[in-house]
Amino acid sequence: MIALPQDRMDQLLKRFSMIESQMANNPDSDTYVKLASEYSELQDVVGKIRELSDARMEASDLAAMRDDASTDAEMRALAVEELPEVEKRIAVLEQDVQILLLPKDAADDKNAILEIRAGTGGLEAALFAGDLFRMYERYAAEKGWRVELVSASEGDAGGYKEIIATVSGKGVFSKLKFESGVHRVQRVPETEAGGRIHTSAATVAVLPEAEDIDIEIRNEDIRIDTMRASGAGGQHVNTTDSAVRITHIPTGIMVVQAEKSQHQNRARAMQILRARLYDMERQKAESERSQARRSQVGSGDRSERIRTYNFPQGRVTDHRINLTLYKLDRVMEGDLDELVDALISDHQTALLAELGEQP
């Protein structure tokens, strides 16, 4: 039996009942929206707590029936038969409740900015960056998310030297946040006549999309420069200074957007800058909170090799959790659930271990 914080569970049940009561009393629209949001957040955990409470009561009744000598023999036999099944259900519900009580990542419900950059490996690295982007596009489509291209620099032989996109939908960041790091590919390039396996890499960064309320950027802390945007072959995209470079002076973070619309470039550059600053704050807070926990699923360091895609063997290996799957073709088609769920599970296990170490 898992030792669950009963006081915390009772508080949640009491708060949920209070919200239900307040919502039934026709509050003003602003109050109703806030109550509805909190109601939605608590619904899953409260539902599981109630299920667990009912199951424990059922188990108690069955145990009493089994141990009561005055109970009909047939009823006692039925209690003996049913009690183990109810106890199994309790064990599952206790695990569910335990996970639902874990501290929430405030960014989990946010949309994400996905950045993929070709690393070592030349032309092949750019092709692999393109393959990764298509993999995430297909995964997003399967989840019902929307992917919107922000900017792209194409590779000389296809793929991308760099591609940035926003991914919007329910639970986007919670699913994609463990994708940050170096992804390595081992395969025979199409241009390789000798059939030799080449190794190349691409770096993935997944940032929670930040809003003004999440991170403050003061006007005096940024410098905005405009320049001519150039296209393929160095040709000017247009005759105006449309490219925008925004530098965040305190951190030195620089963002460049070079599409045709200067207004759009500025808005998108600020969007990316805000996300990077917010992510930097999150990483700093996470590091201070628990170095031990970060080491479980990897540090989140963009230079950390997290996964290898071996095409000759048809396998993908996630080095952080020592998980190898022999279904590379399906993974590249966006079948990422097994990888993503395993990473989330490992993270939850680490959180539980950390909570268990607290006095």
Curated annotation (Swiss-Prot):
InterPro entries: PCRF, Pep_chain_release_fac_I, Pep_chain_release_fac_I_sf, Prokaryotic/Mito_RF, RF-1. GO terms for molecular function: translation release factor activity, codon specific. The keyword rRNA processing does not apply. It comes from the Bacteria. The modification N5-methylglutamine is found at Q235. GO terms for cellular component: cytoplasm. The keyword Iron-sulfur does not apply. Residues 283-309 are annotated as: Disordered. It is found in: Cytoplasm. Gene3D superfamilies: 3.30.160.20, 3.30.70.1660, 6.10.140.1950. Keywords: Cytoplasm, Methylation, Protein biosynthesis. Pfam families: PCRF, RF-1. Methylated by PrmC. Methylation increases the termination efficiency of RF1. HAMAP family: Rel_fac_1. Peptide chain release factor 1 directs the termination of translation in response to the peptide chain termination codons UAG and UAA. Belongs to the prokaryotic/mitochondrial release factor family. This is Peptide chain release factor 1. It comes from Brucella canis (strain ATCC 23365 / NCTC 10854 / RM-666).
